[in-house]
Structures are given as C-alpha cells and as structure tokens.
C-alpha cells in the first residue's frame, strides 16, 4: 500500500512474472482520517491478514504443505540463485503466493513447474528434516488433481475438483445431504446451507466439519476474533460495535442463523466511514456453489465520490420504473439500495491480491429482497 505520493512520482506498475502484472495502489485521503479511525483500520486489517492460510487450505488440500516447503527451500538455498532451476522455483513460488495455491487464480488449472523434480527433491533433502515431505505428483504430475474447480460435463464435479471443501463424498451424496437439510429446514429465511463447513464422510456417515473457533480453522479464527475484539475499542458508533459482536458470535458458534443476523445488521450500519468484510462469503470456488471461500477487506469511504454515487442511488425507484424491461419484471418498491465509493485499505484471502473492483452483498436472496444490499465501488483499485 502506498499513500500520499505525488502524481508525478507514483508508479502503479510493480513486478511482472508469467501472465501476472502486479500493481500498486494508493490510499487517497488516508491522512484525513482521525487517529481513532486509523486504529480501527489497523485492528481490522490484522484480522484480515490472519485469514490467509484458511484460503490456501480451501483452495487445495496440499496447498499449505507445498507453500511452506517451497518457502523453506527458497530461504535455505545455498547455491547459485541465478541458476535456471532456482529462478524457475522462485517464479513458481510467486504463482503460489498470488493464487493462494497451486492453481491459477482465474482458470483454476494446475501450475506446471519449470524446475526439475530432481532439483527440488535434492533441495528438500538438504534442509531441515522437520519439513513435511510432499507426496509424489502433488507438484509435478499434471494429471493428479489437475483443476481446482472442474465443472466438466459427465464428471463427478466434487471428486474431479481439487478444492478442499469435501472429503470422501461424491457429488450425489452432497446433493442428497443438502437437499435433506433444505427439506427439513424453514421455507422462509433459510440459511445458506453448507456455507461454512467441510462435508466429510466417515464410514457410512456424512457430517459437516464446521469452520468456527473450536472447529476446523479454529487456530486462525481465534486470531481473527482476537483482533475483532481489539477493534471494538475504536469503533465509530454503537452500530459498528454491535456488528462486530455479531460477527464474533458467528465465529464462535458457526451457526448460519447468526451469520444472517450479522449480515442484516452489517447492511444497516451506514453511518461510519470505516467498514469491512470478514468471513466465508463467495461460493465461486466450489463446483457445487455452496461453500464460501474466506475473504477480507477493510475500507473507508471516498467521501467526494460517494456523494456523487448516492445522488444516483437516491433515485433508484425512478431508474427501476423507467428501466427498458417488461413492466412485470420491475420492482414496485425498491428497497434498501445503498451505493458507496470506497478505498480499500487492506485485502486478504480470496480478495488478495486479485481483488474485485466492486462488491454487492449480502448474497442471500431473502435478505436482499427484504433488507436490500450494500453496493460499493473500490475507487483506488479501478
């Protein structure tokens, strides 16, 4: 993050490798924030950073082991760092850092390393024996778990996808499990079943391993909650405090009903200049469209640009009434449309480093219908 650098000296472009161009971004008007607001951003940013390993693990069962082994080789390498194999390993490691794993962040295809397997094996054997050895094929065999999200026709898309949301279950078993939950659950205001859990088969039984403070990913979530608690000392208003408390309760219980309550109150909080997203949100990384990848963003309002945007959102009903669609598809009453322009202060998880340029949440259809949504454009990334 770069802040307060003149237009004539600021260079948006950073390093380039393979098909990736890294870009820098500024934090305009950050100096105009109060010390208290900056402290709030700091605590929320720390909470964002501690979700990184969750995303790595979600994106592939072996991602964390591969990353940590690569990092150990990189740090302990004593040979010629200009040599082809080491340079190729360095580029591969950058791919892994960027994509939160060994699969392309957009295409979801497995990366093909350009360093030799013999080179890598020798370097692993030359360093600390406490490092976990990799199994054959996890890096070098393109046929082993070749795609993070595989929706190819005719395949069991759960078993053919390398993402780490399911353990030992088939596509049919996933469909049956969640169909039963939906059938037995409420017809109105239903939770987003499966959003925060790994579905696991043990023997003949199938259960959810819920992502919460005393469940899976508990070590990382405990640190996230620690910094959320620290952030409470610097909130801008009582509603922000309420929102943070609700998020903490959700992380402690893993109860999706609590997540919906949090989402509604997060949506209602409009007065503070600082806002954030922290949790299991988007389901694009799951071939079944159920499991939320962890993501985080800390933001503050771009006041001038928000003023312009809100002039449009205030007239949302007029735009709906005059939209060029069949009248039967127009909403008679437009609810809860808010539009802000924000500056991203910190990105994490599935939002980093390939970030969205805009966000519209919550995702639950019934919340959007009854309570509306928050729509933001990220001005310092566009």
Predicted ranges, named:
Residues 5-9, 14-40, 151-382:
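Fold-level signature of zinc-dependent metallopeptidase catalytic domains
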Residues 63-70, 86-96, 221-228, 244-252:
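Short amphipathic alpha-helical coiled-coil/interface segments
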Residues 81, 85-205:
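Auxiliary tRNA-acceptor-end handling modules of aminoacyl-tRNA synthetases
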